[in-house]
Amino acid sequence: LDAAAPGITVRMERELDARILTPYFTSHFWWMGNGDEPLCNWTSWCTQNVLLTVFLLPTTQQQRQAAVKQAAYSLDCFLKDYGADGCCNEGAQYYRHAGLALWGCLEILSNVAPDAFRPLFRETKIKNIAEYICNVHVEGPYYLNFGDCSPLAGRCGAREYRFGQAVGSDALCALAAEDFRADADPDHLQNSDATTHINLWYRLTTAFAEAELRTYTLPQPEQNTVWY
C-alpha cells in the first residue's frame, strides 16, 4: 500500500486509533454493557469490529488484554438477553449482526486464547443461537418475519457455515451451503445492505470457505417443530 500511496498505512493506523481504539479504551458506550439494561445487535457487531482492529494492528499487549477483558464482559451482557432457546428477538434480518457477529467475536477470541474461548462453542445456548436462522427459514430466500424485519433476510453463506462447523450443526452448514450455491450474488455486491460486502474479513472468510461450500454434501432435511 505504501508503494502505491506513500504514508497511507501510517494514516490508517492513526485514524483507527483516533476513531476506534482510543474511544473504546477511554469511554463507555451503552452497547458495551453496564448491568441489567437490555442490549441488541450493536453489542456483538461493534465488539467484533473492535476486536478485528485490535488484533490486526500493532497494538500493545496491554491494549490486547484490555480489549479481551472488555469484549468478554460485553458479550456476557449481550448473552443475558438471550433465552436458552437462542431466539433472536430482533428477527432473522438482525441475526447476521447479532448471533452471527457473536460467532465473529468468539472466532477471533478463540484464535487469541483457544483454551479459554473455543470450548464456548460447545455450549447448548450458543448452538441454539446459531441454529435460530435455520428454524425461522421458510423456503429459498424467505424467512418468518416480525417487527421491522423483512421476510427477505438475505442469503446465508460462509460465516453461517463456519458457525455451523464450530457448534457442530449439520442443519446450519447445510442451509449455508445450499444458500451459497443458490445465490446469484454470493459476494453481495448488489445487496443494498452494504455491511455484507464492505467488511473485508467477511470477504476473506468467503474466499477461504468457497471450495467447501460448493462441495459440501447436503443431508436430508429434518422436520423439526420449534417454539420461541
What are these regions (language model features)?
Residues H97-Y228:
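Carbohydrate-active enzyme catalytic cores, enriched for enzymes
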